[in-house]
């Protein structure tokens, strides 16, 4: 069980691993505010200026070092975005590093909240090259500067050799199955493409596999 509040003095940053994207040659720390953490940006930038001119400069990510495994895994984070996008929960099966020894995402999933919906991006890494595609999505309006709890459930489907991901946020719920979904992984949060605030993070595991029939599958 992981249960972290990101308010000032309520958590220990040294218990988390700072991660970078292979698309950028930097690794930023989050900035501590009274009630949350936020990815770094120049306060002189307006939201519109940040999005138009500095979107590649504000990436920050961290992962909890406790590996999650079980027939069912629940991960959630309370988050908000100031403008258009794009706070997310990240799931990575390994604690990979780049060629300089810095923690960096290779194969992983991103579950993203933004003003027009929810996206699940699947990243792969082969031959030294990072690539990605949109694995699942839902379109719905989400408001800036409003707190949302983004929930991700990963469940092993009984009788099948694969996992199902279910995403829920703001009354929107969807899911999908994919043989590439990991049965065990590390989880964390990423702020990017705008000012993103994170208020808490939770994760828990269980041993009950998903019964497709009981879940409405026919």
PLM regions with names:
Residues 1-73, 158, 206-218:
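Low-complexity, Ser/Thr/Pro/Gly-rich disordered linker/stalk regions
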Residues 40-46, 110-113, 179:
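Short, exposed beta-strand/loop patches in secreted or surface proteins that constitute
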Residues 54-125:
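Secretory/extracellular carbohydrate-interaction modules
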Residues 60-67, 135-142, 188:
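Beta-strand-rich interaction surfaces with strong enrichment in secreted/lumenal proteins
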Residues 75-77, 145-159, 165-167:
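Short tryptophan-centered beta-strand motifs in secreted/extracellular beta-sheet-rich domains
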Residues 126-149:
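Short, aromatic/His-centered strand-loop micro-motif at the edge of beta-sheets
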Residues 130-133, 172-177:
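Surface-exposed loop/edge segments in extracytoplasmic proteins
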Residues 174-200:
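Flexible glycan-contacting loops in extracellular carbohydrate-active proteins
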């Amino acid at each position: 069980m992981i249960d972290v509040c990101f308010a000032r003095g309520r958590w220990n940053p040294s218990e988390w691993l700072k991660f970078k994207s292979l698309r950028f040659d930097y690794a930023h720390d989050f900035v501590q505010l009274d009630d949350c953490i936020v990815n770094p940006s120049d306060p002189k930038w307006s939201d519109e200026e940040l999005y138009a001119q500095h979107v590649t400069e504000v990436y920050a990510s961290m992962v909890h070092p406790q590996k999650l495994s079980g027939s069912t895994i629940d991960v959630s984070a309370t988050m908000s975005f100031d403008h258009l996008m794009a706070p997310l929960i990240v799931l990575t099966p390994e604690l990979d590093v780049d060629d300089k020894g810095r923690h960096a995402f290779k194969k992983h999933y991103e579950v993203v909240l933004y003003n027009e919906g929810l996206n699940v991006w699947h990243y792969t890494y082969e031959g030294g090259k990072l690539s990605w595609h949109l694995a699942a999505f839902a379109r719905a309006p989400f408001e800036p500067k409003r707190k949302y709890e983004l929930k991700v459930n990963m469940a092993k489907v009984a009788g099948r050799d694969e996992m199902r991901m279910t995403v829920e946020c703001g009354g929107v719920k969807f899911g999908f199955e994919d043989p590439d979904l990991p049965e065990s992984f590390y989880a964390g949060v990423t702020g990017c493409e705008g000012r993103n605030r994170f208020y808490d993070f939770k994760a828990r595991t269980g041993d009950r596999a998903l019964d497709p029939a009981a879940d409405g599958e026919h």
